[in-house]
């Protein structure tokens, strides 16, 4: 067994990445903590839980806790009831290195119809020898336990330096629940955490266990081709040095089928590049694991997949011109860079001349199309004539794409990233190609730039999540109100299990480590408190008519996009939207799969998300429960969001993307059905989960009543509101209908504005108190000229709440606190913990004891 390093908690420590910090509070990790716990039947010992199948009787509780962000909770029910409950030293095979002077500390709470006054407790070493005694437990509230190990009876030769688990033997009722928190050992000033660990312990354990976690994930991938087809399995076998001869034979037989198939595949071309750099004769990692025959065939297939698409003239265009979609674009360009590097160092290929047609972007993306009567010889590509007539080899391409990629990542540090930022799946694809540049570019400066970009991207992620559940507004988040894949990567980087399947295998082996400040930010939501996180979005089109030749498959997003991403982040919930200029010119990506709403700490299945109500029965893509293809106008100030399905917006599509029907459809708000409590009153819906509350109000006028009361104008003004009328209208209460097993409401007016407001138990002891405060807020619909088109005015809860004025009938810019929304927000990223002036390329991250500065500007060409 590997033994855990015992930590000193009173000194200043220096990490491997050169950052220094003084020890802060301990941190719990949402993925690890419940995995440490297991149960057993009477007479048996608990076993190390399976990484793939942790014990489902254990979960986390953000509301009832004593330390950190959450406690671990055990729920006894049916088969889940047990007589032995405990926790292991590590899910990766490490053990506790203690001594007889150590003291076990933990908080424990029991809720049961039968509560014994004391429990048998045992610590077990790797040889099965035990340290036994009893521990006293209080009543139904929390009990803090300090258990000196010297007070327990040790079996002969019990090894204090090789302890693998701690368990309690007890009898519980069928309705029992147990909470554990703050579990750790102390001996003098020595500290070793179990559920709650110091930052240094967590980072050290992440490094020490990485090889084990890689091996476990890749072994699962190697044995199960369903996790990504045979090619991912082949990679895993080569990495683990297992069945190498058999894998080589299969690769040799299968490569030709991929020579010309699906040239825009998100998998195959970057896969071939990685196989070359990991396993070819020239590899600096595992040289020679593919045979010379496989290597030769791989190079031939890679050349055929890339030589036409790798057009040097496209490396001279804007890095904000995106071919096809954002992830496809970076896939193609990253592969152009890396394949050029491969071929410039291969004797058989280094002197070959590339076609460099100069036709434009998106070669082979879809059908050839029409190029013009004078360009009948073209079989593919765009209508541009960019070729300069010169001959370029692989080295020329490599240096052109190297410089392009440097600018690409610097630009995204300056203006914001990505169009598909926070997407449920597409951003994960994009990171595949970010990684390809990071690991295989062959240029030290570019590697440093991408390393900084990783740090920035994960800092952005960490600030808008609670226990791995990502808040923040999302684009291209199709058909699903739930979470995304990025948490799978982050779980691994924080020390959790890896995933060796098709879209994740690369993240295991790139050597990337999180900076200490990002590690802390991700795991210390409680200490960060409540804050606003505001950042600039990207994806507004250049509004060029006609579009430049060669961009028939390309987005033109080289703009200072007028998209403001806004999140109000608390330890209990995150409320988010994107506020965008009414005249912003959208791309076909920036309107796709728009997610906004509220996520909650206590239960990731509790969400409040605006959705489209899809009723298609044609079997097509829109035959889904919820449709995210909606466009919104929004205004948010801290815990209050006012949003409405947009009546109008503007969009430019590349030639290939059809100008389909507008997304306008019946609008709904998704709630789910996992709430602790739900109430409806005076047109509002109130919900509670854990320490959070929310209030939702579709705001609609009482049309029938108003028409009965209204004073009519005469003459040609009879269709307008009269100047003699009252300025406001009566609000309707019956504004929505529950649908789909009462999990979602459908608005009776698809253009009705919706108010979403959050609250916390720190401010309101009960949901009733929150309801009373919300119902007392100032809410009105003001008339304009045309009946039915109003201006909503609302001020939320709290003394610092700002008045939001929102015209629901036109594209007028809303005001917050009397000021118009500034869509040219001066900061690219801004929260109390991360700041960057727009287009500066300088990012400053700070917490109370940690800091990190990212300087992209120093890499710019002078």
Stretches with model-predicted labels:
Residues 1-4:
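Positively charged n-region of N-terminal signal peptides that target proteins for export
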Residues 6-17:
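Bacterial N-terminal signal peptides
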Residues 23-56:
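Extracellular carbohydrate-recognition regions
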Residues 25-28, 171-197:
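Extracellular polysaccharide-targeting segments
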Residues 59-85:
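Short carbohydrate-recognition loop motifs
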Residues 76-157, 173-179:
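Extracellular ligand-binding interfaces
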Residues 189-331, 335-337, 341-392, 396-405, ...:
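Ser/Thr/Asn(+Pro)-rich, low-complexity disordered segments
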Residues 435, 444-512:
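Extended amphipathic alpha-helical segments with heptad-repeat/coiled-coil character used for oligomerization
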